[in-house]
Structures are given as C-alpha cells and as structure tokens.
Amino acid sequence: MSNASALIRSLLIYGLCLPLAVFLGYLLANPQDFTTITVVTVVFSVLIFPLLLRWHHAWLIATWNCTAMLFFLPGKPAVWIGLAAASFTICILQYALNRKMKFLHAPSVARPLLFLTAVILLTARATGGLGFKMLGGDTYGGRRYFVIIAAVMGYFAIINRRIPAKRVGLYVTLFFLGAATMLIADLPGRVSPSLNFLFVFFPVDNLAAFTNQNSVVAQASVMDRPGGLAMVGLGCFCAMLAHFGMRGVLDTRKPWRLGAFCFFVLAGLYSGYRSLLVVLLMTFALLFYLERLHHTRLILPVILGSMAVGGLALLFAARLPLTVQRSLAVLPYIQLDPVARMSAQVTSDWRVQMWHDVMPLIPQYLLVGKGYSFSGAEQAQLVKDSLGSTELAGDYHNGPLTVILPFGIFGSIAFIWLLVAGIRVVYHNYQFGDPAYHNINIFLFAYFVVKVIFFCTVFGSFATDLPMFLGLLGLSISVNGGVAKPVFVPQPKIVFNRFKLHPSAHRPVGA
C-alpha cells in the first residue's frame, strides 16, 4: 500500500512540475516581457513561501546591508527590499491570526516614524506622485520613495520578534558583514570572465570594465578607488567591535584580534574615502571612552601607539598608495602627493559650490518640499551638467539638505524626532539591557551616535541613511526584546519597634 501511495505521489509531482517547467521554458524565450516577469515572480514566490514562513526574520537581518538584487524584477530592487515587504506581510497576517504575536513594544520610535512616513507620502502626492519610470511612468524619482517605504516596513518586520538568545551573536555579525558584498561591485575587470555570472545577482560599480575586457584601448585612471573595500573594512570593523568590544579587541592575550582589526582598517583606507577614516576614528574614540578604558592601564599603550602611527604617517605618508593618501587627506600637517591632495580638494570644492547653489532654495521648499519626482524633460535639460543633474536628483552630499529640501520643515521635524527617540532607545538598551549583550548594546549606541553626528555635520543622504538608522534601531530592539528599562530593587525599610527592649536590658545586674 505504501508503494502505491509513493507512486501516486510521484506521478502527481511529475504531473505538476513537468508542464510547469515546459511553460516556464516557453516564457523565458522572451525574458523581458511583462507576462514572463509576472509568472516567474509568482512561481518563485509560491516555491519560497514555506521557507519565508520559517526564516523570514533571519534572512531580513542577514541581507539588510547586502547588495544582492532581485534581477528578474523591474528596476532590479535589492533583496532586502523584497524580504522587507514579504516579512512585513507575513507579520501582519500572523498577528491577524494570532493576537499574541505582537510587535515588540517601542512606541517612542513608532510615533515619529509613522509621522515621517505620512509627511513623505503627502509630499509625494503633492509633487507629482511616486514617479516609477521603470514601470512606464512619465516621471523619475520613485525608486527613493520605494526604498524609504521598504525601510519602514523592514523596521517593523525586524521588531516583530526577539532574536533567540543563542543566535544573537550570529545575527549581529551577519547584519554588519552583509556590507562586504559591496566588494563584488569592484570585481569586473579584476577577475576571470567566467565569473561574470556573479554580476547578474550583484550590482556593478563601473560598466566600462566589461568593455575593456575585449578592447585594445583601455581607459586609464590616475587613481582607481575600490569603494567595495570601504564597505568591507567598515563591516568587519563593526562586526569585531560588536562581538568582542573594544576591550576584547585590545586584549593582549589574543593578539590575532588586534592584527585582524588593523588589517580591516587598512583595507578600508585603501578605498580612498576620507569619510571612512572619520567614522572609524569617531567610533574608536567614543567606544574607548564608554568602556572606561581611559581608566585602565591600556591608556598608555594606546597613546604611545597613536603617537607612533602619527609619526610614521608624517614621515612616510607620501610613499603610500594614492588611495590611502586620499583617505588621509582629512588629517592636517601631513605631506601628501599633490595628486591625492588635489583629488580630495576638488571634491570638497564641488560640494561647497553645490551647497552654495541650493541654499537659497530652502525658503521656497520650507513648507512643502520638492520631493524626489522630476520629469524626463528636466533630466534631459541638465544631463550634460553633472552638478545640475546631482541637484535635480536630490543628492546634495549633505544630510540636513537631503531632508529639508525634499520634505520641508515638517519632514525635518519628524526626522529629528526620530533620531532623538532612536538615541534614547539605544542608550536605554546600553544602560539597562541584558549584561550578556553588553558589547553589542554599547557598540550599537556608540555607532548610532557617531552616524547621527556624521550625517548632520560631514556627509549624509536621507534616502540612503534612513535604512541604516532603522536597521540599527530594529536590531537593538530585537536583541533586547524591546526598550530596556531600569530594574528597581526593593530596599528593606528599617522600622523602630518601641516596645522591644534593647539586648542590654536582659543582662544580669551584676554583669
């Protein structure tokens, strides 16, 4: 009987799979057709749905900073965007079926986040809609709205449940190491063409590398900046500090940690981004202070090591690779190659000029922001001007400007409210969280504060940094099961009993 059941089951499976495979093969003959994309998406979703029910929370956290993309969808959105939408939908359905499966309690973040989302949607409605050109619309700019909405859904999906205690370290490590996939964007032209299939799943930083593989004349560049190395260095830097803490990284009994830490820092500096050096130094200094290491005997080795590194930089900085010199251009009193110094100065002047041009626009968009939408005619008019096209896209390379110009004063108020509430949440989890997660909580607090300061003073982009801020907040809340609160230990109250005699009263008179 069992053999007959197995045979019937096999026949049913083959009867469903074979016609489906033939039908998909027929559709894939025209892969760009909308019907093909729709059918493939539906089939893929049905097949992966059982796995999503079990692992959607873990997958969302692991891919939050990953650059992998859903190549078969219009616009090729990132994998984390698709997982955010799927995970949020699953969480809503689970709560509708079981009221006990509530989201973790963090109303202090939910209120400003919902207010900010409402401001963004109303601004989009008032300035021409979302503008999905990739879906056949007449306007551009909808991709950034799409990313912002996905980040909001992803935040609520992350705080849907608490991370299991045994997997907290793994989830946090995967969260930060996902940024290392950015290195794949720099591989074209550096790896064998047989590995080009990777670039179907991951975005490419420079398409010219593909043309140069079969070209006799290649494009020469004075300074090639591999941006993926910056994300590798930053991701490993964050993962090590979150896992070991500053005290653990500087532990002399395990020197491999400090060696690996320095290696990843140098790898990041090889990317040529000055902003990375600023973030690393600020995070290192704040963590060193928060862990009270300046009150320990580590303070002297750190001071001597810093002086030694500074002295070597003053003497030999001009002999380092140009990209490393460009990263060090933010430091004063260092002799650098004129090429590296000029490259850094040109970008600084370019940004200052752009800020000077857009600052007069603030009163115009103070009440109602300009949004992200713009027409194809506007793009064609400014396509020859790199500065004009950057301003049109809202990429001002300045955090406050990327908030107040697109979304006005109300968007700025909502975002400031969100940042203040976020700092309060990570601070409470750092102060009153589970001692087992002390290294994670103290790093999340320090890193969040550093990113807020960096966003407001050095460099920032609202559409890019909002997912980062919400990811850090969601991770902190999910690790601690909400917002930690101080535990009040009841103190015994001493009450004098006036009817009870002192022990000396019971002694004999002659004693």
Show where each model-derived region lies.
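A membrane-periplasm/extracellular boundary helix in multi-pass inner-membrane enzymes
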Residues: 5-8, 118, 184, 188-194, ...
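Long extracytoplasmic/lumenal interhelical loops at the membrane interface
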Residues: 339-356, 360-407, 426-432
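Structural signal for the C-terminal ends of transmembrane alpha-helices
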Residues: 46-55, 89-102, 157-167, 239-250, ...
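Hydrophobic transmembrane alpha-helices and their immediate junctions
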Residues: 385, 406-450
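Hydrophobic transmembrane alpha-helices of multi-pass, membrane-embedded glycosylation machinery
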Residues: 42-48, 64-68, 83-89, 262-265, ...
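Alpha-helical transmembrane segments of multi-pass inner-membrane proteins
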Residues: 1-23, 43-49, 118, 152-157, ...
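N-terminal hydrophobic segments of proteins, predominantly signal-anchor/transmembrane helices
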Residues: 48-149
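Transmembrane alpha-helices of multi-pass inner-membrane enzymes
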Residues: 239-241, 280, 284-285, 418-421, ...
